[in-house]
Amino acid sequence: MTFWTANSVRAAVGGSWLARVPANAEIPLTGISTDTRTLQRGQAFFALRGERFDAHDFLPQALAGGAGLVVIDDPSAFPPELARNHPGAAVLRVPDVLEALDRLAAAYRKKLAGTRVIAVTGSNGKTTTVRLIDAILRTRLKGTASVKSFNNQIGLALTVLSAKPSDQYLVCEV
């Protein structure tokens, strides 16, 4: 299933192309990944930073793994030799990768017009509550619920982006 295209991601999040071959072709994307260890061919890879990691360091693995699009905010992470080794790469530079991920999730949420969203908040028991709501709704409806304890900014965006356009519900942990 095509998630979006590289061009539609750029339209949703902004940014400028560091590499785009061929310049006017549509690159279909099958989903989103923030981890090269679980990246599947055709997914867009968002190079996020954390306290102890910088996913920009893993661009060679993302490109070798078949990322259909790479979203970065540090252009030095895509040096000329990496560009030469991956001539078909689509690399989008944005001011902030996390903000771009949030923008994409917000744009995608607007496309889920027929999907009811349920947000579960609180200090304890969110994941269990999400699982219970999903188990009940799944008996009669088609939907998506957060896969893990995705109750932070990144996890919420990934949960929204994992929904299918045909879903009747989306259960998020906030």
Residue map of PLM features:
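N-terminal leader/targeting and accessory segments in enzymes
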Residues: 1-103, 107
